[in-house]
């Protein structure tokens, strides 16, 4: 079931969490639902943006902040033009996330979480194993800090909730903001 968009007002939906928590999976699934319902949607994935817009940046705190600020600039620009922007980026530092989201016309901060043992099991690239062996320096959640949101708009435990359950929570949050009306994934 889908309906016509309620508004042309844009929004930044910022998915934050550790690698493997499900940020990109959720953003892709939500984008599909919203696009099928006629909403203007763009996805900004942290890995893709880092490869193209932030090529050459490392993983120091300064470089990570620069990367997040770049993503935020693009996201906020699109949102100001009526686009629902779905950002999936680890974005480990609270202060930088808050700074970027403060500039958004409207925002929804989504904390995507799963326990470390689950993230390690999900890790098909073996990045966590390498980080735990010390082969990857500055790996968020292992040798570099991740500061979870203190008061996210939506908190999704992907180890306890299915993808459809997570989508239900996200759609309900978008409905509360009067961004969408009754978009269904069933």
From Swiss-Prot:
Function of the protein: Catalyzes the synthesis of activated sulfate.
Pathway(s) served: Sulfur metabolism; hydrogen sulfide biosynthesis; sulfite from sulfate: step 2/3
Active site: 91 (phosphoserine intermediate)
Organism superkingdom: Bacteria
PANTHER family associated with the record: SULFATE ADENYLYLTRANSFERASE
Catalyzed reaction equations: adenosine 5'-phosphosulfate + ATP = 3'-phosphoadenylyl sulfate + ADP + H(+)
Protein species of origin: Chloroflexus aurantiacus (strain ATCC 29364 / DSM 637 / Y-400-fl)
Gene Ontology terms describing biological process: hydrogen sulfide biosynthetic process; sulfate assimilation via adenylyl sulfate reduction; sulfate assimilation, phosphoadenylyl sulfate reduction by phosphoadenylyl-sulfate reductase (thioredoxin)
Pfam families: APS_kinase (PF01583)
InterPro entries, A to Z: APS_kinase (IPR002891), P-loop_NTPase (IPR027417), Sulf_AdTrans/APS_kinase (IPR050512)
Gene Ontology MF annotations: adenylylsulfate kinase activity; ATP binding; sulfate adenylyltransferase (ATP) activity
Keywords: ATP-binding, Kinase, Nucleotide-binding, Phosphoprotein, Transferase
Any Gene Ontology CC annotation: cytoplasm
Family: Belongs to the APS kinase family.
Protein name: Adenylyl-sulfate kinase
UniProt binding sites for ATP: 17-24
Protein EC: 2.7.1.25
The organism's taxonomic lineage, starting at the top: Bacteria, Bacillati, Chloroflexota, Chloroflexia, Chloroflexales
Keyword Ion transport: no
The keyword Kinase is assigned to this record: yes
Residue stretches spanning the membrane: none
